[in-house]
Amino acid sequence: MGKQNSKLKPEVLEDLRHQTQFSEEELQEWYKGSLKDCPSGHLSVEEFKKIYGNFFPYGDASRFAEHVFRTFDTNGDGSIDFREFICALSVTSRGQLEQKLRWAFSMYDLDGNGYISRQEMLEIVTAIYKMVGTVMKMPEDESTPERRTDKIFRQMDKNMDGRLSIDEFIEGAKSDPSIVRLLQCDPQAATQS
């Protein structure tokens, strides 16, 4: 993402090859597309929310998009550059399950203290419910954000301290694939659980 060149510099390309799961060709294609969509080289939270919202026309994706943006913006400068975007995309689209879960944990851990509180989980789950609108039919025990949060905590909070450690989060998700679908808000969650 930048005005100067339509191709990544060889040293940047090499670095991104090692940091991501993308081939050189894929990285160049993503870079070319990002120049077209974002000539400034940086995506603001408002621009990101607008783009993200296009994928969820029947709901309000703005709150969830803000959480995704915060997690993509690894240097915390309030914008996403190509490196941040492509590294996050690599984890979320091609990473191993544990990498994806660690990434998701960092999004849910709003205050960055290494734990997900019930309130943090509720904030994210509420944002997901607003994003999907009425498109997804939820089972009765997940019919509200509060109920879904309670269900996740019942299944994951093994030491019952009211917060999820990264180990509880990862183990809980790995031991019950329906939780992964719940966390990712997979529309098939209701039919496969």
From Swiss-Prot:
Presence of keyword Repeat: yes
One GO MF term: calcium ion binding
Sites of N-myristoyl glycine lipidation: 2
Keyword Ubl conjugation: no
Domain EF-hand: 40-58, 60-95, 96-131, 144-179
PROSITE patterns: EF_HAND_1, EF_HAND_2
Pfam families xrefs: EF-hand_7
Binding-site residues for Ca(2+) 2, renumbered to this chain: 109, 111, 113, 115, 120
Binding positions for Ca(2+) 3 per the UniProt entry: 157, 159, 161, 163, 168
InterPro entries in the cross-refs: EF-hand-dom_pair, EF_Hand_1_Ca_BS, EF_hand_dom, Recoverin
Binding-site residues, Ca(2+) 1: 73, 75, 77, 79, 84
Keywords, comma-separated and alphabetical: Calcium, Lipoprotein, Metal-binding, Myristate, Repeat
Note: Probably binds two or three calcium ions.
Annotated family: Belongs to the recoverin family.
Name of the protein: Neurocalcin
Source species: Aplysia californica
